[in-house]
């Protein structure tokens, strides 16, 4: 995803330009995958962070794909008696439910924070601190 798109997503999520929240964002991503891209950044307060930014339109694209899969599953269950082997409609719905939760970065932020609390009991475990006030449905900010 182009850096300009990252800045557009951040501005849309925060309701202000990214440079009002971050002192610096490295334009080169640390990593990139099908759902999101991660960039190294520095907050205005000086902390080094990682910003995970969801690709625009990823939910809409998946919704179209799932709609097609629903139609195929419906047709397949009429032609092939697969209900004795696997519930195709159920599999498609489970896929969609999982995808929806994975694309809500507020859920991811809460899970990270919960794991950090859990891991605090163990000296050999650690988890990045989440900056909850900077997390949205499409952005996660962590140390």
Name each region found by the language model:
Residues 1-143:
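Broad phosphate/nucleotide-binding scaffolds in NTP-utilizing and phosphate-metabolizing enzymes
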């Amino acid at each position: 995803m182009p850096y300009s798109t990252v800045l557009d997503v951040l501005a849309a999520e925060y309701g202000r330009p990214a440079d009002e929240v971050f002192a610096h964002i490295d334009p080169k991503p640390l990593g990139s995958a099908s759902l999101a891209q991660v960039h190294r950044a520095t907050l205005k307060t000086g902390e080094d962070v990682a910003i995970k930014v969801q690709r625009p339109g990823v939910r809409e694209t998946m919704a179209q794909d799932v709609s097609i899969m629903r139609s195929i599953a419906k047709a397949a269950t009429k032609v092939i008696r697969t209900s004795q082997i696997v519930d195709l409609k159920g599999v498609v719905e489970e896929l969609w439910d999982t995808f929806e939760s994975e694309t809500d970065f507020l859920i991811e932020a809460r899970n990270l924070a919960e794991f950090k609390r859990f891991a605090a009991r163990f000296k050999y475990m650690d988890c990045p601190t989440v900056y909850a006030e900077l997390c949205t449905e499409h952005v996660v900010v962590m140390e």
